[in-house]
């Protein structure tokens, strides 16, 4: 592979070349309805998916444990179920957040309305259980279904914290563990499970994935304080929704009690002037840099654990994935 500073997701996926087409075929069948109108919505979602980080993690961990042998349908099923969970959560998130765009295209709720978007997300969730039951791979279905519960819990806890402006480091890490890290952790764990790795190895893969997932969300929260031309997103979008994330928590940890209280009041206001003041405080107290340090610790933890696996293209790709996620600009 090329230098880690210039690694691309396509290069990371290179060891999976013989399996990606099979996964894509499985996913296309999963996102299908007999209704032509409904199928138009599902095809739109299929055509406008994101980077595919989570199913890639599933397959890389499967490769890590099966020694490069052909995967078989269990792995393609596991990767597809993970991507379906992620896809359904994004459709529902866009409704909750009233988001008009997703991956540079109109969101489903913008294009087809909120009612159809809700039903589309529900349909995708139903396909997860239908595919799992039809395949009789109950161990995989049971394992991945846990994350649906955790995603919902994380959203509700975050909503409560947003209303009270009482976010703390402990609550923040609990929220991102449930909202984001859980799905990446399950992605890695189910990759091992799909090739029938021992339970202890599944747990080990899960732990690595959790560290990657925590870093992934922290990076997202750091990017929210970056310039809009770097991310393609509105600067401080979370603050506009009264969300306190790690860069601000790290900045507030350096403040006096009085200044911290005043800053939380500014978050509650959420207007442009207040956001400008908060942004200046995050810069003043090196909130982004401190958050970067915490993110780097999670990445280092994941990479240290990966060193214990035998050298292989899959291990190399997973190490590169850690660098890719840490260095991404959007």
Where are the regions that the model predicts?
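All-alpha prenyltransferase/terpene-synthase fold signal
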Residues: 1-330
